[in-house]
Amino acid sequence: MDKIIIKGARENNLKNIDLEIPKNKLVVITGVSGSGKSSLAFDTIFAEGKRRYFESLSSYARQFLGGNDKADVESIEGLSPTIAVDQKSTNQNPRSIVGTITEIYDYLRVLFARVGTPFCPNGHGQIKSQTPKQIADFLFSLSPKSKIQILAPIEIKKGYKINDVLNNLRNQGYLRVLVNNEVYQLDENLPQFLDNKKTDVAIIVDRLILNIDHQTKTRALDAIEFALNYSGGEIAFKVNDDIHYFTQNDVCQVCGFKIKEIEPTLFSFNSPIGACEQCKGLGYNYVPDERKMIPNPNLSINEGGLDYFKNTVNTTNLDWQRFNSIIKHYKIDKTKPLKELDRKEIDLLLYGSDEAIEIDITSANNKKYSSIDYVEGVLELVNRRYQETSSELAREHYNKYMSEKVCKSCKGKKLSSQALSVLINKINIIDFIEKNIDEAIDFLLHLDLNEAQTKIANPILKEVLDRLGFLKNVGLEYLTLARPASSLSGGEAQRIRLATQIGSKLTGILYVLDEPSIGLHQRDNDKLINTLKEMRDLGNTVIVVEHDEETMLAADYLIDIGPQAGVNGGYVIAAGTPQEVMQNPNSLTGQYLSKQKDILVPKTRRSGNGHKVILKGAKHNNLKNVDLTIPLGKFICVTGVSGSGKSSLILETLVKAIEYTNFNPFVIPGEYKDLIGASNVDKIVVVNQDAIGRTTRSNPATYVGVFDDIRTVFENTIEAKARGYSKSRFSFNIKGGRCERCWGDGTIRIEMHFLPDVYISCEECHGKRYNDETLQVKFKGKSIYDVLKMPIDEALVFFENYPGIHRKLQLLVDVGLGYLELGASSTSLSGGEAQRIKLAKFLQRKPTGKTLFVLDEPTTGLHIDDVAKLIKILDKIVDGGDTVLVIEHNLDLIKVADYIIDIGPEGGNKGGKIIATGTPEQLLSKKDISYTAQYLEKYLKKN
């Protein structure tokens, strides 16, 4: 069968649709936000494919895979095995890096274990082990008649007493030992050796005068074999007065630096064998931060300059009294601003006394106690409490004084010194993974290996280079293999999974992808489209939910779902080739693709309010000492290829620098020299795509504050007044009006212990969250539950006579969310929906003319028509006098900006510079160095 035939799909808002999708083609599903694209692609096609696969497994296997409900569809024919590559489930494990999730690091561990060469980290050259034959050859090369002692070195392990070790050797029957080059008879009284001093101990296995006769050789070889076995591969010869050390292990002959057996586990930072002992393989330690302890050095101790003691200074608090002993003993002035104290005094306050001092304590019943002891400083106190506490609440309190600091032992490289001493072509494994993908490919292609090493390395190199090539082909060449997985955007994580799938070379698979172009610059879009076509050409069906114009035009088959969102969507409006969809007068997507509809370029650009914020010398991550000027009162767009440094400059440095300067001294911005004009900003609003709440109790109505107003309306109904119900009666979070069986959740969680928890609708309230008495109170014939189930569009009309409610709902409609239910669970919302809800909340405030709005890729998940609505909202903010700063790749949004800041020219180490600034028209003069300018020119002409 060459088609997937879907009949009667009714999942979510789908309207009983019938659809035929050609197999082994690149199929794009598009439509306005909330129209039903994901309901068709993920909740119907993928869900049914997964369910059928699970049903083919044994009942024993299925019990570990959780519930897989049948999609609400009559039938699907021609379905292949399905794989979803979405933007969810980004790994938050701090130990996961790009190298581990792509499995490239596993191959590298084998490569370094088999081909790497150990070198002494103290500069003593290559570390070589010797074979027993080489050791014996050295012995027999000595001058005849030489006096030889064959020694088995003993390692005195930590915690063991030297005399106890020697007594144990005596009990084993040994006669003589060499201790610090002195011979001792074990059957005589031994001196008491100091355990805290470095002591070299060796058993004298044999003493002989070197001859070349057979008997002497045999005796010497037996002694060598015994010494090597006893000492774990170590041996020494005392020749006259000189000692010569040899080893079968990897040990430096000069300084004794020893390497464990070189196996792949030595290079794993998740294994105790390879991980740095101090940071346990994380590369950083969590330690108290002086900047957080002294957020305002203009304050004195009495004024709360030491933040931890600000509420207990000069009280009977025991911690304070003990700490105050330092202040008394060293006569530190508590009334002086901390910035006027000398460094020694600050160190005493932070790190404590380096001598025992007098401590005076007065108890609650006024008894006085004195003692003499060392006193810990405030940072040491916080660190100890943080490590010792088992209370999450206390840990959270101490947490605000802590920061991640690079591990001093491994310098952030995560591995032990033994692992880091193994090199290939002068670099260790961490040096290699800190290269970006392009640099890594170049390094591997130019490896200098001998014939034997090449034979071992070739199959490993093929696997690594293939995977690196796939990452490059999906536009991720700027990433390093050491990049933490938790720092990846949804789009980056998805494209990494995409690269992994290409590497599998599977055929006959149905892939379902969710907006793979997110976060991708237009320059890299062609690479992504070629990757999708490559997957198709392997004999797979590739279904992509996408809004990107280039991807839609590259599709073999385009499906437009609509016409609108929510209850007004769920229909197949058009299906066919992109050209056929463009010719369909009912298709909104077709109208935009054919340019019958368009987002118009403004005739004039705003000149701003004349004020600026200037950031100087930004060096965070890959930023190259950047000076940034933000003209206020404008719509500003920050552009640049993926990984060029946009987020590092704006979110990590500029935003945090303004927050640190104006609002929150606990925020730690990226490195910069100076910030000028921060006083021109009285509020900074970052609108990101994080969820609006962590539980099902959060919803759009509660987040924007309209639910309080709606509950007030119900409180004022005649029925509610007659029953004496207050506003709180209509809350599903408070006892009284809510259903007590499910505590207002509407669902009940059934714990399955070893299986995933199961959620069922509450039998008492039938999922309505409230008890019957509360639901009997009606407003215009609707209960509070009915109102929460309303789409926002419908609620807007329902509450048209209530200006406060109407205004808040109108803002949600304005940002394109009219299709959402008022009570939609926050956990069911996409990142783009969450971002627009936040925007609607902030738009309730009156413009101050000094607010800076910062949005990170706000067009994520938006159809072209929704982008047009978003632009109207952003224009409204700027027209009110405030400033909008957007990090964006979408050219429809970039072309309407007043001012563009383009960062590049490339990603990673080749980026980090501002290469062009100005209006879109001014940017075109830099198209020789700016990729954004090149595509913007085409786009402006096209539009």
Curated annotation (Swiss-Prot):
The UniProt entry, under InterPro entries, shows:
ABC_transporter-like_ATP-bd, ABC_transporter-like_CS, ATP_grasp_subdomain_1, P-loop_NTPase, UvrA, UvrA_DNA-bd, UvrA_inter
Residue intervals of every C4-type zinc finger in the record: 252-279, 739-765
Main location as per UniProt: cytoplasm
Q: Which Pfam families match?
A: UvrA_DNA-bind, UvrA_inter
- PROSITE patterns, alphabetized: ABC_TRANSPORTER_1, ABC_TRANSPORTER_2
Report if keyword Lipid metabolism is assigned.
no
Residue ranges of domain ABC transporter in the record:
309-588, 608-937
- Which subcellular locations apply to this protein? Cytoplasm
Q: Which GO terms describe its cellular component?
A: cytoplasm; excinuclease repair complex
Keywords from the UniProt entry: ATP-binding, Cytoplasm, DNA damage, DNA excision, DNA repair, DNA-binding, Excision nuclease, Metal-binding, Nucleotide-binding, Repeat, SOS response, Zinc, Zinc-finger
Supply the SUPFAM superfamilies for this chain. P-loop containing nucleoside triphosphate hydrolases (SSF52540)
Q: Which GO terms describe its biological process?
A: nucleotide-excision repair; SOS response
In terms of CDD domains, this protein maps to: ABC_UvrA_II
Residues reported to bind ATP: 31-38, 640-647
Q: What binding partners and quaternary form does the record give?
A: Forms a heterotetramer with UvrB during the search for lesions.
Belongs to which family?
Belongs to the ABC transporter superfamily. UvrA family.
Protein purpose: The UvrABC repair system catalyzes the recognition and processing of DNA lesions. UvrA is an ATPase and a DNA-binding protein. A damage recognition complex composed of 2 UvrA and 2 UvrB subunits scans DNA for abnormalities. When the presence of a lesion has been verified by UvrB, the UvrA molecules dissociate.
Name the record gives this protein: UvrABC system protein A
Give the organism the record lists: Ureaplasma parvum serovar 3 (strain ATCC 700970)
Its gene is uvrA
